[in-house]
Every structure is written in C-alpha cells, then in structure tokens.
C-alpha cells in the first residue's frame, strides 16, 4: 500500500529528531522537546503521528539540570537505552548521560547519577552504532562552547569503542572530523560546527553523517564523510552538503537520523527545519525524505521537499 505525506510532519516545536522502530512495528520519534526532559511521538506508518508525552523527566536527583538535547534510543539485550545531552548541575557544562527503560515509551531512568564520561570539556549529541561483528561505537560532538582552536570556537566529532554496558569506553576517544570545508564556515569566522553524528554501514563502508553551521541559521545543513573503519580515517565528500536549504520556504535542514521505510525497501532521512523560515530559531519541526547510495558509493538525499511524497507502507 502507498501512503502520501508532506513535509513538515505533524511533530512541532522540537529539534534533533531520532526515530526508532520497536519490535512490534511502532515507530517512536524522540527529540529535543522540553526544558526538563524528553517527549516522544508514535506512529504505525511514519506518516501519522501522535504525541505520547514524556518518556524521560528530570528529578531533584538528576545530574542534568537544563538544556536537555538530542536523545537517541537503542534496543540492546532486551532493554531500551537512551543517550542524551544536558547541562551538568555540578559545573554548568554540557555532558552526555544514559538512561534505561523496559519499554520504548519509558519511563527512562538514569543508569548512574552522573554523565557517562567527563573528559574536562563540553560534549553533546551522542550516537551509538552497532557493527556487524558485534562491536559497539559511540560518536559525539565536542561542543564549541568550550573548544577554542586558533581563536575560533569549534565543534569536533569524536568516536570511542563502547564496552558492553554502553556506558564506558574501551579506549580514548579519537578525533574524526572538524570544520574544514567551505560550506561549514558560513555562520561566521569565530564559530564553526560539526555536530549531530549518525553512522550507516553500506557495502562495507562507514558513512558518517553530520550537521554544520549554527543550528538557528538558514545555513544549517547535512554533510557526510566515508571510511573503511568505524573509527576512521573519515574523508568528507567533495560535493557536501547533501541536504541544505534550496527554496525560501525551507530553512536549516539538519541534525538527521535514518530509518527504513515500513516495507524495508527505502531509506528515509529524518531531520528538522525551522518552523519560521524567515526567522530561524530553536523552534523547529520534523521532516523526512528519501536517501540512498549511487553505484559509485556516494550518498544522496532527495530533499528537502515540501510537495506531497509517496511512501511504501508495510505489506498487506
């Protein structure tokens, strides 16, 4: 059966959307969505969405105090693990934490009452990747708020192999990407970003998708880099970005995740855009467009779109 949808999807006033398909076929969209935690939305077909309320909410004992951003959820050993960013009450610096739940609908509870790691700098946008050999990797952004390079504030991407607890690293994180391409420097010379990592494996190659430029600017866009190993070295595509503002009505498409269509025949990039394209801000909404790989291995996105699109639903 074919369904029709049109961007933006009915998930609004959010940022950094991540979509998970649960074993029962229900889709969960987690996002930056509340000042004190995270809400989720559910769907049976990726087209029709219903708000499910809070799935994680801070308490008086929580290590995170504010700025709850970019939740991602994975199913592992029968439980659901959420990695998220927040501002640490101890020092007001951004860190990444992990919470666990028995259901994708929560409630998620912090595994420990502290960030999952503290390397003395601000870190956000955690992403877990499971490789075919069973090894697990954690990607994140070293935030520009506390990373000054040659007088510029820069966000850099790192990776570390995870232990089985999904909480601790097997070794020191490795630097894998930093702003260097022309399109990544359009928000000005003093602040530059590589953030929002998401990794896919295709025909033995590792594709690191990421966003660059200021999130509340029209120039926020998605690029990617390729490697033969999950830890790099990653080489950025020469024709980046692959998702960017192409018409006045669409501003700042970025911070993506990827999900298969209900029938498994297509890959879909889920991302956010600014609600008001003429006044970009933290008020964003969810969009979704097809993506894929060319014969030469290069990645493409058919978007951003704002006209009706068809999607293949689960088989009858």
Q: What residues fall within each predicted segment?
A:
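Carbohydrate-active catalytic/glycan-binding domains of CAZyme proteins
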Residues: 1-316
């Amino acid at each position: 059966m074919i369904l029709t949808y049109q961007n933006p999807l009915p998930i609004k006033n959010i940022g950094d959307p991540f979509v998970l398909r649960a074993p029962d076929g229900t889709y969960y969209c987690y996002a930056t969505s509340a000042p004190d935690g995270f809400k989720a939305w559910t769907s049976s077909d990726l087209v029709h969405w219903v708000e499910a309320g809070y799935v994680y909410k801070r308490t008086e004992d929580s290590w995170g105090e504010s700025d709850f951003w970019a939740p991602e959820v994975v199913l592992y050993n029968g439980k659901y693990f959420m990695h998220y960013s927040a501002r640490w009450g101890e020092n007001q610096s951004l860190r990444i934490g992990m919470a666990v739940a028995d259901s994708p609908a929560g409630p998620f509870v912090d595994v420990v009452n502290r960030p999952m790691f503290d390397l003395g700098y601000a870190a956000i946008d955690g992403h877990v990747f499971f490789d075919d050999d069973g090894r697990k990797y954690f990607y994140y952004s070293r935030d520009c708020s506390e990373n000054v390079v040659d007088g510029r504030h820069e966000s850099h991407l790192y990776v570390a192999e995870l232990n089985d607890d999904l909480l601790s690293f097997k070794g020191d994180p490795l630097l894998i990407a930093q702003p260097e391409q022309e399109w990544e420097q359009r928000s000005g010379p003093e602040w530059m970003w590589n953030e929002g990592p998401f990794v896919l494996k295709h025909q033995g190659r590792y594709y690191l998708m990421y966003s660059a430029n200021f999130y509340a600017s029209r120039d926020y866009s998605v690029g990617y880099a390729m490697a033969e190993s999950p830890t790099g070295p990653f080489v950025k595509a020469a024709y980046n970005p692959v998702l960017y503002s192409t018409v006045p009505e669409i501003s700042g498409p970025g911070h993506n995740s990827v999900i298969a269509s209900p029938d498994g025949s297509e890959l879909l990039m889920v991302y956010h855009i600014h609600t008001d394209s003429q006044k970009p801000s933290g008020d964003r909404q969810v969009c979704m467009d097809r993506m894929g790989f060319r014969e030469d291995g290069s990645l493409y996105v058919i978007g951003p779109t704002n006209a009706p699109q068809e999607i293949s639903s689960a088989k009858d």
